[in-house]
């Protein structure tokens, strides 16, 4: 059994030597990196690295380049899964790694093209600078400014979109409220107009008008001119007739009580003109010698908005035309 190490307490064999393992790169790895990341073909790479000195310089930079590519991949994966208080640090580290990788790619391309002459000490100093995983203060400040600017732009865009949505919803609510309030207002105007008209005239629903034989059979009509201050309506009032003793008698009539009757014409002849001040129409006295009889069912009158029953087979005074 060998002796025990005083640091790690692991047994080790006597005369055992340990070597530090290094990430060894070969020419195949260099060609893969230059074709995949720099966009060069294999034939171009073979010609570019024909110079042995340039090939050695590229091989010295390649391990550092691959190490930072691996770190960048880890930062990309941790960006979405890390804790909230670590997001700013991960974002800063990602920007820093991208800056380092871009710088190394530029140096590698210039060395391969032969436009960049660097000594071995400069290559080692460059590798040490990037290997310490540190950047200058200006690089860190640039990364932080980029993060802050992105945060401000995102906040401004979100605020603008939110204000536009709130304004659109407010306009829609105002339009809907205007539509809902429009119908009652129109109804109120119609009701007010109806109330105004209802006070202008009234019609006695118990009065009976009998039309004599002089009206032609097949069409019975009474033309009533209704006028008031607001409108003029020409209403043609017709009904089904009943043939009694060779005459035509109106069996039903529609009388508009919400309008003032100014002139009544029966069979194109003016029979009477009621006084506009009177609220009821009174028929003139006529002899009761005509045998015509009014046969009336239900007469619907708009005055008062109710239907009244008129006795059937009621005899009344006849106005001969």
UniProtKB/Swiss-Prot annotation:
Subunit structure: Oligomerizes. Interacts with UL7 homolog; this interaction mediates UL7 homolog incorporation to virions.
Family: Belongs to the herpesviridae UL51 family.
Compartmental location: Virion tegument; Host cytoplasm; Host Golgi apparatus
Superkingdom of origin organism: Viruses
Pfam families assigned: Herpes_U44
Task performed by this protein: Plays several roles during the time course of infection, including egress of virus particles from the perinuclear space and secondary envelopment of cytoplasmic capsids that bud into specific trans-Golgi network (TGN)-derived membranes.
Major place of residence: virion
UniProt keyword terms in alphabetical order: Host cytoplasm, Host Golgi apparatus, Lipoprotein, Palmitate, Phosphoprotein, Virion, Virion tegument
PTM characteristics: Phosphorylated. Palmitoylation is necessary for Golgi localization.
Keyword check for Lipoprotein: yes
InterPro entries, alphabetized: Herpes_U44
One annotated Gene Ontology cellular component of this protein: host cell Golgi apparatus
Protein name, per record: Tegument protein UL51 homolog
Residues with lipidation of kind S-palmitoyl cysteine: 8
């Amino acid at each position: 059994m060998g002796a025990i190490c005083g640091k790690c307490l692991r047994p080790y064999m006597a005369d055992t030597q340990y070597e530090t393992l290094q990430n060894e790169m070969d020419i195949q790895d260099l060609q893969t990196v230059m074709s995949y990341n720099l966009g060069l073909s294999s034939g171009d790479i073979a010609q570019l690295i024909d110079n042995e000195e340039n090939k050695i310089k590229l091989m010295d930079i390649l391990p550092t380049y691959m190490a930072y590519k691996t770190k960048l991949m880890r930062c990309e994966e941790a960006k979405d899964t890390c804790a909230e208080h670590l997001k700013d640090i991960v974002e800063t580290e990602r920007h820093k790694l991208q800056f380092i990788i871009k710088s190394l790619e530029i140096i590698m391309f210039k060395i391969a093209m032969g436009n960049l002459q660097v000594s071995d000490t400069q290559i080692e100093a460059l590798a040490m600078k990037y290997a310490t995983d540190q950047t200058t203060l200006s690089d860190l400040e640039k990364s932080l400014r980029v993060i802050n600017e992105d945060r401000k732009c995102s906040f401004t865009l979100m605020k603008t979109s939110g204000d536009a949505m709130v304004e659109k919803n407010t306009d829609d609510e105002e339009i809907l409220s205007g539509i809902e309030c429009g119908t009652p207002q129109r109804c109120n105007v119609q009701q007010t107009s109806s109330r105004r008209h209802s006070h202008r005239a009234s019609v006695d629903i118990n009065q009976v008008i009998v039309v004599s034989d002089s009206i032609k059979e097949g069409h019975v009509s009474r033309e009533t001119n209704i006028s008031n201050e607001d409108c003029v309506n020409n209403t043609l009032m017709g009904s089904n007739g009943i043939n009694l003793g060779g005459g035509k008698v109106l069996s039903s009539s529609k009388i508009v009580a919400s309008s003032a009757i100014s002139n009544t014409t029966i069979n194109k002849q003016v029979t009477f003109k009621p006084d506009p001040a009177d609220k009821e129409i009174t028929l003139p006295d006529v002899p009761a010698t005509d045998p015509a009889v009014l046969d009336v069912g239900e007469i619907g009158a708009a005055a008062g908005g109710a239907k009244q029953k008129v006795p059937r087979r009621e005899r009344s005074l006849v106005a001969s035309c």
